[in-house]
Regions:
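Non-catalytic C-terminal accessory region of glycerolipid acyltransferases
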Residues: 2-19, 83-87, 124-128, 152, ...
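Membrane-anchoring hydrophobic helices of lipid-metabolizing enzymes
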Residues: 2-137, 170-172, 181, 323
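Short Gly/charged-rich anion-binding patches and loops
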Residues: 31, 65, 121, 145, ...
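Catalytic core of membrane glycerolipid acyltransferases/transacylases, capturing the structured
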Residues: 129-188, 214-221, 225, 255
Length: 323
């Protein structure tokens, strides 16, 4: 049996402490999600949408972060439009998570008929050519599903992740992610294990939109504002000798289908400077997210790092004060 952690890979392992009564609530939540995942999507999606919107009204801090992000990224939209985007975001989140749980429980053959790939020929050609690949994946709510589907088809996948605060949720979530194989690398272990996996032929999964602070980031345009963006994908392409391929999943709660959009490799970044790389990374996020903003995790502190002299928007008391 594999240990929880080897030289480069994180492997979730059940701990006997998870049986303690303090975790019973978490297990109840896991059981509820499993039951929901086994419910036909035409029944579960409307219910999950209503529950998600309701939770979004209760989660005032998360809602505030989302509204702040949207107000800076889409100032041309009315307040009502931004509120509607946030409502739809909270509706989409549990729907996408339920599809991920369904995939883990029932297997890919049960959800493949509801998955549409746009640009699948790009992936197939790279597989035929035995190329090394790093997917550039904006942080959408269905972000894990494409990697799980590719892993279920025999493609070796590797991704980095942050641990969940609740150890039971962390164990279950990462067990689901590894359901069909692949490697998980904890961000706390640095980027070297991820690089090692890609060099060994695993296709990498890289989320470009987290705020890593000002030290190694570039301040570049992001929708109507700017963002501190780490130009890591360019460096990863070089050290891994890999091609960077933008990918984004979109879950439609009305049709109960997942569309996975794949764009052409970003080969233009091989000779680009850091500023250009960072801007191109944000540009790909804009192309994917702009038409379907409800798919994106606007609750993150995407715009935390600001230029000298500017106040972090989430600390500004004039922006959406919590009542």
């Amino acid at each position: 049996m594999e240990t929880k952690k080897n030289n480069s890979e994180y492997i979730p392992e059940f701990d006997k402490s998870f049986r303690h009564p303090r975790y019973w609530g978490a297990w109840l939540g896991v059981a509820a999600m499993a039951g929901i995942a086994l419910t036909p999507p035409k029944f579960r999606d409307p219910i999950l949408a209503r529950l998600g919107r309701f939770a979004g009204r209760l989660g005032k801090s998360s809602r505030r972060r989302a509204l702040i992000n949207l107000s800076l990224c889409f100032p041309e939209r009315s307040e009502a439009e931004r509120e509607a985007i946030v409502d739809e975001m909270f509706a989409t989140a549990p729907q996408a998570m339920a599809m991920m749980a369904e995939l883990a429980i029932r297997g890919p053959e049960k959800i493949q008929p509801r998955v549409d790939w746009q640009g699948l020929e790009i992936i197939e050609e790279m597989r035929r050519n035995n190329e090394k690949v790093i997917f550039l994946v904006p942080h959408g709510w269905a972000v894990d599903i494409p990697a799980m589907l590719m892993a279920s088809q025999g493609q070796k996948m590797a991704a980095m992740f942050h641990n969940q605060g609740n150890p039971v949720f962390d164990y279950v979530w990462n067990t689901v992610r590894r359901r069909f194989g692949g490697r998980l690398h904890a961000r706390n272990d640095g980027i070297k294990p991820f690089i090692q996996s890609v060099r060994q032929g695993y296709w990498g999964y890289y989320l470009p939109d987290q705020d890593h602070g000002p030290e190694h980031s570039e301040f570049v345009d992001f929708f109507a504002t700017y963002k501190a963006t780490l130009p890591a994908i360019g460096r990863l392409m070089k050290v891994c000798r890999a091609r960077a391929v933008p990918l984004f999943p979109i879950y439609d709660g009305k049709t109960h289908r997942l569309t996975i959009q794949v764009r052409l490799p970003m080969d233009d970044l091989l000779e680009a400077d850091d500023h250009t790389i960072a801007r191109r990374m944000n540009e790909e996020v804009e192309i994917f997210v702009g038409p379907r903003p409800e798919q994106y995790t606007w609750i993150l502190k995407l715009l935390k790092t600001r230029k000298p002299g500017e106040i972090q928007p989430y600390k500004r008391k004039d922006l959406y004060p919590i009542k």
